[in-house]
């Protein structure tokens, strides 16, 4: 009986140590993007409602498993008319494809706190592999709630055309979409 108890205790301890769960601090996070309009100006936007889960046992996050889900209907470019157009079948078709997801496949450390984040991005019913730059801004303990926190910046560029996202010519709205995400995680 002692052996079984010790075995169960070791198993539970192993599970706890193996994959530490990190959750998104939504008040300190933004999932943003920008595109070029008419080849002369940038238009910025974000998804106001998104969630991110990170599981990692290593302090440098090289073993992290990252899952992101964003509500397409929460797209916000500070212009209601444009936001409505982006939600329409001309672009995201939010009625048919209400969410976009990202699931990591690997994280490779490039140098000090810089990583290559590889995963599958699904939006508008299309899944494609993407490689993003990820920067670990730091880890610390929040003095107010005593939780461990970590901050990341994620940057990358995708093509609208890869996801069948709008037939508007690139001279009007760039095919390249720059992703800029800043996230703070709690453990």
Label the model's feature ranges:
Residues 18-187:
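Low-complexity, acidic/polar, glycine-enriched regions of mature
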Residues 1-22:
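Bacterial Sec-dependent N-terminal signal peptides
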């Amino acid at each position: 009986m002692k052996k079984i108890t010790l075995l169960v205790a070791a198993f539970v301890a192993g599970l706890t140590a193996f994959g530490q769960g990190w959750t998104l601090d939504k008040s300190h996070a933004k999932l943003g993007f920008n595109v070029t309009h008419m080849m002369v100006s940038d238009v910025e936007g974000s998804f106001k409602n998104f969630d991110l889960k990170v599981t990692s046992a290593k302090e440098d996050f090289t073993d992290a498993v990252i899952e992101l889900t964003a509500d397409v209907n929460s797209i916000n470019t500070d212009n209601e008319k444009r936001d409505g157009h982006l939600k329409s079948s001309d672009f995201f078709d939010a009625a048919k494809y209400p969410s976009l997801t990202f699931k990591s496949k690997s994280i490779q450390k490039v140098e000090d706190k810089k990583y290559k984040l590889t995963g599958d991005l699904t939006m508008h019913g299309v899944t494609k592999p993407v490689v993003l730059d990820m920067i670990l801004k730091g880890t610390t303990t929040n003095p107010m709630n005593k939780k461990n926190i970590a901050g990341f910046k994620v940057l990358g560029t995708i093509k609208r055309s890869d996801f069948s996202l709008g037939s508007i010519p690139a001279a009007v709205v760039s095919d390249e979409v720059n992703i800029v995400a800043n996230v703070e995680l709690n453990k």
